[in-house]
Amino acid sequence: MKQDATLEKALEPVAVRSDEGEARWWLGGLAVIKATAADTGGQMTIVEVTEHPGVEAPLHVHYRDDEGFWMLEGNATIEVGEMTIEAGAGDYVFGPRNIPHRYKVGDQGCRMLFILTPGLTSGGIEDLIRATSEPAPSPTLPPVPAEEPTPEEIEGLKSLLKESGYAELLI
């Protein structure tokens, strides 16, 4: 049986310590890219996301990858299609591509893993995070944003997503 070239690349061991990864201040939270598509031969991308209490990710849909949410600390209400789950530490929620989803962080804040499959080496979550964030000076949450995003900022994000073909904001 012939193996896919990306699968062969995934055979290289990768280890990322808890204090390692590419830390970015992203949309008011902290995103640490732990495993890239390149690291895993295109099998997955893993991003550790820490959010302030009350943060809401807008309703959106991915077209090229599936997204899993593994809650490490805190809590969030996660909606995927018609399913709503109050997720706490240790819970996992799977969001298949083409199904709209969103979350609202609970009063404890949260730290969770986004597990995206397959890992997209171009035009995926890694590119989106880098294009819409800044390097974190330390792997800590940024200050709480003083204001909500402006309509112009939201439209800019919508345009970026549409141009990439990766995802779409449904707001």
Predicted regions mapped to residue ranges:
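Short loop/turn motifs at secondary-structure junctions and domain boundaries
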Residues: T40, L59-H60
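Double-stranded beta-helix
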Residues: Q108-I171
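Short, conserved beta-strand element in jelly-roll/cupin
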Residues: I46-P53, V61-V80, I115-P118
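A short, N-terminal "cap"/entry segment at the start of jelly-roll beta-barrel domains
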Residues: M1-M44, P143-I171
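Short acidic-glycine-tyrosine-enriched beta hairpin
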Residues: A15-S18, D39, G68, N75, ...
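Short beta-strand His + acidic residue motifs that chelate non-heme Fe in jelly-roll/DSBH
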Residues: L59, I78-E79, A87, G95, ...
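Short acidic (Asp/Glu) patches
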Residues: A31, G54-V55, P96-N98
